Each structure stands twice: as structure tokens, then as C-alpha cells.
């Protein structure tokens, strides 16, 4: 009798294959259970721009996701244990309550990922103009200049933050296996396992993460892992000048197709732009903080913007101090680096679909 391989059940809320269990009176996946618990315990009410009539995956709209938790999955608010004190309550929640004088926190609509893709080109153009202007500024007094060189939110100087990312790619080499050279799914799983643990460690030391709640930190870990497994592997693959044929006959065809996609897009871009270590460290940090594939809180968006601006200011200072580039050349170079994020967005989206198809944790 042939063995029937049972697929994971589909979560009725997010519609992803997952380990569905009973949580708060409804059968849902662990991620949706955590979302429901956090929403209820913090007394958050989300708003939907389509009056809770969004189609497709509910993960793209937190209001519709919560609505499905209650109406479709049958989850019950009264089964969630209320927080006894505000010790672990995110600061933005406490500030919102203080400003409004209301215990309920109303949060606005979350834009879908494809809207962010379509508006990103405009963002790049604005960034180029902004950094050209920044490069020309030289009239500020030394004290004010030093004051502006420190992020008040992250509590670290722009240069030190960039060094944090440089250290990651130059010193942390506990796993020399490269994803683009794997010969089997087993090797790939070994790499992702190591990088998942490393991502957890990096999240503990990353400036500003202490201001985020646990749900945001779990999302951030995925971005760190993605950047290590795919982006850094691509850069190392180029630097090592890999031209030796790899026996990939045992590799899953879907995984092989994605690896070839990475080589034909990101690898080609890297070979054209010729990043040095400092530029790549800056690019990697942007990839981590500009990826907004799943829903993120306002606090996380603030921290992400702070990382982006601080790293880019440090990169701009590096160009001004250690290269002969003028302000327009600096603006153009930073624009090229930023523009490359668009292909990384698509790459992350395709990777997410691949992991689901392969039944890998994501």
C-alpha cells in the first residue's frame, strides 16, 4: 500500500500551510495566535481602508486578519489573559494612550507590498536629491555637527552603526558554506539552521531592537536570516570568483531555479557595481530594514528609518573623506545602491513562495 504524505493544514486566517492548533477557542497557526493575543492584550483596534472587505491573504491587512480570527476561526477575546502591568508594553502604545486619554489604541491602514514596490522609484529619486544636498552642507558648527552625527533613538553614532554591519560581514564566519554552491537540500537546511541561530543573536545586539516588541523582533530575524543566506552568499560568491562546476543533480529543481535566478539578477548587479566592503555592509543593512513584506508596527518603521538614514549618512561621510568623488557622484552612487533594493524586494517575495512550496519554515 503506497504511503500517503499528508500536507500541513491551511490556517483559515492567513491561508498558509502550517501546524494548526487550538488557540483561544479557534484552530489557527501559531503566528495568527500570537497576533490575536497581542492585539487583544494591548487593546488595539485596526482600521481597514476597504471596510474589512479585503480579498486575498488576510496577512496584508491587520484589520481583516483580526476580523477573520473572530468570525472565521472563532477565536474569543475573553480567553486572552490581560496584562497585569505595563512593564512589557511597547513605548509607542503607552504614548498613544497618554496622548488620547483612551485605553483603546486605534491604528491605521497598512499598505500592501506591491504598493511599496510601485512607489519605490520615486523614493530613490528623492533620496538622490536629498543626499546631493547633504553632501554640499558644510556651514554647520563643529558642536552641532557632532550632535547630528549621533542617532538619539538608536543611541549610537552613524559611523559606529555602519561599523556594526561591517563587523558582521568581516568577522562572523562560523559557517563558510555558500548557498549558491550547495549540492543538496540537506546542505541548504544546514546553512539556514546556522543562519537562523545567528540571526537570533544579531537581533539581541542590534541597536534599537530593545524598543521593539517580540512580534516585530521575530519578523526582523527573518530579514537578518535572508540577508545572510542569500545576499551575503551572493557577494561572497562573486568575491571568491566561483567558476568550478557544481554537481547539483540532487538539488530540488525549484531551489535550483531560484539559485539561478539570484545569479542572473543580484549577482550580475554586484559584478557591475563592484561594491567594496563598506558599501556592501551599507547595502546589507538597507536590505534588512527596507524589507517590509509582512505587517510591521509604527515603532519598527521608525527604527528602520533611523537605521537607514544613519547608515547612509555614514556612507556619505566615507565617500567625502576617503574618496575623490564630488557631491553629484556621491548622490549617483548612493542612488545606484538604493535602486538595487527593488530587485531584492522581488527576490525576497519569490524566496517566501519557494519556502512555502518546499515546506520549509518561514
From Swiss-Prot:
DNA-binding region, residue intervals: 8-82
ZnF segments: NR C4-type: 11-32, 48-69
Highest taxon listed in the record's lineage: Eukaryota
Keywords: DNA-binding, Metal-binding, Nucleus, Receptor, Transcription, Transcription regulation, Zinc, Zinc-finger
GO MF terms, alphabetically ordered: DNA-binding transcription factor activity; sequence-specific DNA binding; zinc ion binding
Domain NR LBD stretches: 145-362
GO CC, alphabetical: nucleus
Function, as annotated: Orphan nuclear receptor.
Name the UniProt record assigns to this protein: Nuclear hormone receptor family member nhr-77
UniProt source species: Caenorhabditis elegans
Gene name of this polypeptide: nhr-77
Amino acid at each position: 500500500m503506497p504511503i500517503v504524505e499528508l500536507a500541513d493544514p491551511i490556517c483559515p486566517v492567513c491561508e498558509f500551510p502550517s501546524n494548526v492548533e487550538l488557540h483561544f477557542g479557534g484552530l489557527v497557526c501559531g503566528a495568527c495566535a500570537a497576533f490575536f493575543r497581542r492585539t487583544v492584550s494591548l487593546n488595539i483596534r485596526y482600521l481597514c481602508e476597504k471596510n474589512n472587505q479585503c480579498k486575498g491573504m488576510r496577512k496584508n491587512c491587520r484589520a481583516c486578519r483580526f476580523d477573520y480570527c473572530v468570525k472565521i476561526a472563532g477565536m474569543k477575546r475573553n480567553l486572552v489573559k490581560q496584562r497585569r502591568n505595563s512593564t512589557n508594553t511597547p513605548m509607542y502604545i503607552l504614548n498613544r494612550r497618554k496622548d488620547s486619554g483612551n485605553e483603546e489604541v486605534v491604528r491605521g491602514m497598512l499598505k500592501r507590498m506591491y504598493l511599496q514596490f510601485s512607489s519605490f522609484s520615486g523614493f530613490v529619486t528623492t533620496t538622490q536629491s536629498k543626499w546631493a544636498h547633504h553632501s554640499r552642507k558644510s556651514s554647520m558648527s563643529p558642536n552641532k555637527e557632532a550632535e547630528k552625527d549621533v542617532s538619539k533613538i538608536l543611541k549610537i553614532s552613524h559611523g559606529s552603526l555602519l561599523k556594526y554591519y561591517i563587523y558582521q560581514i568581516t568577522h562572523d564566519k562560523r559557517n563558510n558554506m555558500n548557498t549558491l554552491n550547495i549540492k543538496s537540500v540537506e546542505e541548504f537546511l544546514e546553512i539556514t539552521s546556522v543562519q537562523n541561530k545567528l540571526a537570533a543573536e544579531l537581533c539581541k545586539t542590534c541597536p534599537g531592537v530593545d524598543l521593539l516588541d517580540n512580534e516585530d523582533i521575530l519578523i526582523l530575524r527573518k530579514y537578518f536570516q535572508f540577508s545572510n543566506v542569500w545576499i551575503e552568499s551572493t557577494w561572497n560568491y562573486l568575491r571568491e570568483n566561483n567558476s568550478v562546476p557544481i554537481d547539483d543533480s540532487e538539488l530540488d529543481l525549484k531551489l535550483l531555479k531560484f539559485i539561478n535566478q539570484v545569479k542572473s539578477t543580484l549577482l550580475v548587479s554586484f559584478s557591475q557595481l563592484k561594491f567594496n566592503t563598506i558599501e556592501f555592509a551599507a547595502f546589507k543593512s538597507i536590505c534588512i530594514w527596507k524589507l517590509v513584506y509582512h505587517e510591521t508596527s509604527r515603532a519598527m518603521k521608525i527604527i528602520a528609518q533611523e537605521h537607514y538614514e544613519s547608515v547612509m549618512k555614514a556612507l556619505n561621510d566615507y565617500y567625502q573623506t576617503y574618496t575623490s568623488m564630488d557631491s553629484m557622484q556621491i548622490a549617483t552612487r548612493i542612488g545606484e545602491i538604493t535602486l538595487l533594493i527593488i530587485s531584492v524586494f522581488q527576490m525576497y517575495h519569490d524566496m517566501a513562495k519557494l519556502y512555502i512550496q518546499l515546506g520549509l519554515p518561514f
